[in-house]
Amino acid sequence: MNLETVAKVDPEIVAAVRGELQRQRTHLELIASENFVSQAVMEAYSCVLTNKYAEGYPGKRYYGGCEWADVVENLARERAKALFGAEHANVQPHSGSQANTAVYLAVLNPGDKALGMNLAHGGHLTHGSPVSLSGKYYNFCFYGVDAKTGRIDYDAVARIAREERPRLIVAGASAYPRVIDFARFREIADEVGALLMVDMAHIAGLVAAGIHPNPVPYAHFVTTTTHKTMRGPRGGIILTTREYARDIDKAVFPGVQGGPLMHVIAAKAVALKEAMLPEFKRYQEQIVTNARTLADALMGYGFNLVSGGTDNHLMLVDLRNKNITGREAEDILASVQITVNKNAIPFDPQKPSVTSGIRLGTAALTSRGMDADAMVQVARAIDLALSYGPDEKKLEEARGIVAELCRAFPLYQELD
């Protein structure tokens, strides 16, 4: 990572960047929404396309000099369409939240009714939370998970849809560890005359590799981020049919955004090409293997997992039987250099700033090359940190496990 020029201009920023690199190298990253991009993605992200304004779309720009921007955006669009089997792709959204907002703008009027997953049950802020624009401008009602199984109750979803008659149904989640039945969601949407949007931000990499069912054949709109399991830059994509292509494009620009970030779109294109390689499928398979191994090992140590395990890259740990909160667990694990996020569990008695659980994901550790055997060690370190109270010897043992794993699976050696 060549920061010589930056160091001459702004040594404070260089110190922070180098500190962050050291943190990433020496900590176990278990936040489910984080990952480590490739060197190729990182280089594309920092290219000269950051200088180019390109309002509009390829062939229909509002600025001159966009011939190479058009090449880059067309490559990204065509790769997204090919990877997921979509008829149309918009690669301009700056984030998953922007992508979701654009879909709402395209098909809803303020006050229209929509049905989404309850944030407290694993949904996302942009699926109608009252603190989000989505909840302020649209009339969202909610479905959730069954109290006993921790899984989506599709019969309850259908019942709510019949009662509420939403214009749009939103499927997808930010903290749901099980396969989502998109075909069932489409049946429900068709029954009540609703459109279906799927937010696959967390599982897009698994979908691209054929490990999780693809929502594209079932949904009118599919949104995703390009980071998380996709291992690309931070950004968003919308996939849709030809029927809604124009509406979506107008909703993104000029609806919710101005000029696209062309350097980010270049990095998206690189990540999409990487996702087409055979090794990407093997990588995604290892993510799921690692998640299941970590889940099983944690349950072996007496941790309770929402829904009893995982089908994808993430798991929700219910800490109530350990007599600690999610916030306390996050802080304790940080002290042994394991990074997680506190997370509400379904029917959580704690407030969102405290929570009764933590969310764990295996995408970033898998990017470092860690395998199932390493996950057993990760589970051991988590148990040492959380199951024995303030025991400094146990915490030091956990730190030793973390340090050894970080040495055995180094990160970004090429950046030295």
UniProtKB/Swiss-Prot annotation:
GO terms for cellular component: cytosol. (6S)-5,6,7,8-tetrahydrofolate binds at residues 119, 123-125. Its cofactor is pyridoxal 5'-phosphate. Its EC number is 2.1.2.1. PROSITE patterns: SHMT (PS00096). Transmembrane segments: none annotated. Keywords: Amino-acid biosynthesis, Cytoplasm, One-carbon metabolism, Pyridoxal phosphate, Transferase. One of its GO terms (molecular function) is glycine hydroxymethyltransferase activity. Pfam families: SHMT. Pathway: One-carbon metabolism; tetrahydrofolate interconversion; Amino-acid biosynthesis; glycine biosynthesis; glycine from L-serine: step 1/1. It is found in: Cytoplasm. Catalyzes the reversible interconversion of serine and glycine with tetrahydrofolate (THF) serving as the one-carbon carrier. This reaction serves as the major source of one-carbon groups required for the biosynthesis of purines, thymidylate, methionine, and other important biomolecules. Also exhibits THF-independent aldolase activity toward beta-hydroxyamino acids, producing glycine and aldehydes, via a retro-aldol mechanism. Homodimer. HAMAP family: SHMT (MF_00051). Belongs to the SHMT family. This is Serine hydroxymethyltransferase. It comes from Moorella thermoacetica (strain ATCC 39073 / JCM 9320). The gene is glyA.
